[in-house]
């Protein structure tokens, strides 16, 4: 346990806090250490070889120096042997789960593991795989390995002499016929393999569990095999990531001598408020990633629930939902203004039409002296209002009494019933209707209204606005303008809709509107966002 003790000394000197999950792993190692063959020699050989031959391939080109924590990880991966049922001495540890905050060099570390296995693993004709959600992610780790063949003096000589070479299938170390290949997360393709080292990258992106398909082939055909699951945590629930977290936290897994879990994460959400606790999720912070970068992300997330979710998931290792309420009470506050701001002013319209079930909203915005003003006509049918529960009906009644929600005495929303109200707003304010944005799925229903107010032969005054993640830029712009008090509204129904509005966070960090509860109506928010997009488009 030489490297465990060195890591503990390092943590004490640098104020790094160990969470309860890592403490459990340490207890497990102590138990295992007393039962099995300790391979200090193999671990030290791997560490020295890596530090002698490997380079950082981004930023300054310099040799890698593994931190005490990373050396300990190598001790867990390579430090113990057992005697199997055939009487053969084999590597004890088959599975490692590394849950580690974003920017901590997971892919670079895995590149060293792959090359150490290919060249020093002593296995003739073996195969190593990097498995990822898609080909782009798989290439990330694959390219880290390939870059070392150009950066490292030793590997470059191997490369130049065709000892280490690229093939159509991947990379090959010809002396031992060991290969390294990339593969996407496809259960059918994984059947029947016989790989010895498997790197499952960013497992929080996986829906179905491919691990058993890969591990089955390794387990049946290889004496020495190892699968390493790496992730920065994520927002996809009920997939492989959640299964792994649950498994590696369990008592059953604690007594499985052939695996180690490295769950670097906060123990609860409240701990994020004290920066000292961040070392629970980012044990290498200060080296990778930089303190300043993580602090900047934390500060940027203040006042933005969606960014806070992402920070807790990707930086602090906590399983978070991919949906979060988006606007804060400060964002949605009412500011009184007079509708005269629309008088003779270019006015942009967004319309979100729902025939029945949700609300229909027609939002008007105009610009004046650096601020955007909005007013929204919101509609429903009386039969829907009458079916509400008491609490919701009282809320809607307030909107009706304020003149902000218009109830129509029809079975469903008829576009022709909206026209008198639009006419009334135009007459009352003297606004100049300029452009309209609408959901293309509703065009045939809205066509008459659009042509009535926004006809032009080139169609420049009309825009079909794709819904979903395509609205990302304008969703974020609306948030920004509300937070800076540069978008002004004075309607309770709009405040309610904004407070109802959640965003779903995509894999690339894009947002799309959604709602958490059926009773949460967000149609005025959607209409306002489309109107804002039209206003911005007229400035470009």
Swiss-Prot record:
Mn(2+) 1 binds at residues 352, 424. Mn(2+) 2 binds at residues 352, 523. Its EC number is 3.1.-.-, 3.6.4.-. Binds 2 divalent metal cations per subunit. Pfam families: TerL_ATPase (PF03354), TerL_nuclease (PF20441). Keywords: Endonuclease, Hydrolase, Magnesium, Manganese, Metal-binding, Nuclease, Viral genome packaging, Viral release from host cell. Disulfide bonds: none annotated. Its cofactor is Mn(2+); Mg(2+). It is an enzyme of class 3 (hydrolase). The keyword Metal-binding applies. GO terms for molecular function: endonuclease activity; metal ion binding. Belongs to the skunavirus terminase large subunit family. Probable terminase large subunit. The terminase large subunit acts as an ATP driven molecular motor necessary for viral DNA translocation into empty capsids and as an endonuclease that cuts the viral genome to initiate and to end a packaging reaction. The terminase lies at a unique vertex of the procapsid and is composed of two subunits, a small terminase subunit involved in viral DNA recognition (packaging sequence), and a large terminase subunit possessing endonucleolytic and ATPase activities. Interacts with the terminase small subunit; the active complex is probably heterooligomeric. This is Terminase large subunit. The lineage of its organism: Viruses, Duplodnaviria, Heunggongvirae, Uroviricota, Caudoviricetes.
